[in-house]
Amino acid sequence: MTTFLQRDDFAVTARVLGALFYYSPESHETAPLVQALLNDDWQAQWPLDAEALAPVAAMFKTHSEESLPQAWQRLFIGPYALPSPPWGSVWLDRESVLFGDSTLALRQWMRENGIQFEMQQNEPEDHFGSLLLLAAWLAENDRHHECEQLLAWHLFPWSSRFLDVFIDHAGHPFYQALGQLARLTLAQWQAQLIIPVAVKPLFR
């Protein structure tokens, strides 16, 4: 069994990252996390090298004329085209659509494994943030095999490309730092994964 999935820090970091990508920065789920990242205490608790985290921590605290809620709206809601859409099927489907074949494959996998996960409104299950929250839930419930499959089959095949584009187009230091923190953290997870990551073509 992959030991990193059994550590408490995996579930904690997956839940923190998932919430910050999924919920508004003003929400009750996320507002305390935003404040924590604006201080320096979090670095000692994050399972990455302090030297790698230092520039990320500095960027979190960099001032921007655009407010955090405005940046959230622009990056995740619209009304204009999102610079880096957070749904897997946008990257994995030839037509770059929501609810694409990869979303249906994720739903089938969830049904086969008896996994039910509540989404906000009528939203695809393959949102980057919601997949991280699901990974945290699986780890917390000792379903490490399913957690490995979720990461290797349904998240890692597209997450690196999503994060690269997200960082390049974030346009706000907080979300640029969040993208970098996610990229560093997921790279460490992937390096420790036992089962191979599925190779899937990307269309963005």
From Swiss-Prot:
NCBIfam families: PRK11621.1 (NF008632). Pfam families: Nitrate_red_del (PF02613). PANTHER family: CHAPERONE PROTEIN YCDY, TAT PROOFREADING CHAPERONE DMSD. Keywords: Chaperone. One of its GO terms (cellular component) is cytoplasm. The lineage of its organism: Bacteria, Pseudomonadati, Pseudomonadota, Gammaproteobacteria, Enterobacterales. Signal peptide: none annotated. The gene is dmsD. Required for biogenesis/assembly of DMSO reductase, but not for the interaction of the DmsA signal peptide with the Tat system. May be part of a chaperone cascade complex that facilitates a folding-maturation pathway for the substrate protein. GO terms for molecular function: signal sequence binding. One of its GO terms (biological process) is protein maturation. Belongs to the TorD/DmsD family. DmsD subfamily. It comes from the Bacteria. It comes from Salmonella typhimurium (strain LT2 / SGSC1412 / ATCC 700720). This is Tat proofreading chaperone DmsD. Monomer in solution. The keyword Nucleotide-binding does not apply.
